[in-house]
UniProtKB/Swiss-Prot annotation:
Function, as annotated: Zinc metalloprotease that cleaves 'Lys-48'- and 'Lys-63'-linked polyubiquitin chains.
Entry protein name: AMSH-like ubiquitin thioesterase 2
EC id: 3.4.19.-
Site (Indirect zinc-binding): 72
Gene name, Swiss-Prot/TrEMBL: AMSH2
All copies of domain MPN, residue ranges: 49-177
Organism the protein comes from: Arabidopsis thaliana (Mouse-ear cress)
Cofactor comment text: Binds 2 Zn(2+) ions per subunit.
């Protein structure tokens, strides 16, 4: 099933997201002191990423049935690159197997096909924690490593509707610290990770992601 977001997802309009009528705002998330400390790894210059203001709302609605059953839902975020900025225009929800604390994408060739046809970059992913807090589990970190090793700007959105202090977060692995930890870890399942040698945490909140009021996107629900 393909769902088109509103306003109209015409790519001719998407490419004009820098027009004067659009409103772009940095994503600000409260309660970040326990993750960001010391010198942010984003001292390394990263491209800005724009997401639609409707992305979180639309994904949360698509995940509602699973959330009510205490099952996770996941999706891939794909973007095009224009003038040094990534614009997320596509949300792909693959076939998947879920539990209350995990979500495994199936038939990922379908996801790759959509991305390749549209010449899009896999810049991140989004998933729910239906009954847990807003954080990145060890399994989430390994999943995200596979994105960030390809695209340094890759980010992970966690939607946690039952977390009263923070209903969502946008995260990335610290670089080089967190990336080195994950690169050298061969464990599977839920497990602790050592602290990076540079003194930073394994992951942190993103500061280069912005909500764009004029950015249109399409949703491919392949379930």
């Amino acid at each position: 099933m393909v769902t088109l977001s509103s306003p109209s997802p015409s790519l001719s309009c998407v490419e004009n997201v820098t027009c004067k009528s659009s409103h772009v705002s940095r994503v600000l998330i409260s309660g970040t002191d326990n993750i960001n400390h010391g010198e942010s790894s984003e001292a390394k210059i990263l491209r800005d990423v724009h997401i639609s203001e409707r992305l979180l709302e639309d994904f949360t609605e698509l995940a509602r049935e699973n959330t009510e059953k205490d099952l996770e839902t996941c999706g891939t975020l794909a973007a095009f690159l224009e003038r040094g900025i990534f614009y997320v225009t596509t949300l792909i929800i693959p076939k998947q197997e879920s539990t209350s604390n995990s979500c495994q994408a199936m038939n990922e060739v379908e996801v790759f096909s959509i991305q390749n046809e549209r010449e899009l970059y896999p810049v991140g992913w989004i998933h729910t924690h239906p009954s847990q807090g807003c954080f990145m589990s060890s399994v989430d970190l390994h999943t995200h490593y596979s994105y960030q090793v390809m695209v340094p700007e890759a980010f992970a959105i966690v939607v946690a509707p039952t977390d009263s202090s923070k209903s969502y977060g946008i995260f990335k692995l610290t670089d080089p610290g967190g990336m080195e930890v994950l690169r050298g870890c061969s464990e599977t399942g839920f497990h602790p990770h050592k602290e990076p040698e540079d003194g930073n945490p394994v992951y942190e909140h993103c500061s280069n992601v912005y909500k764009n009021s004029n950015l249109r996107f399409e949703i491919f629900d392949l379930r």
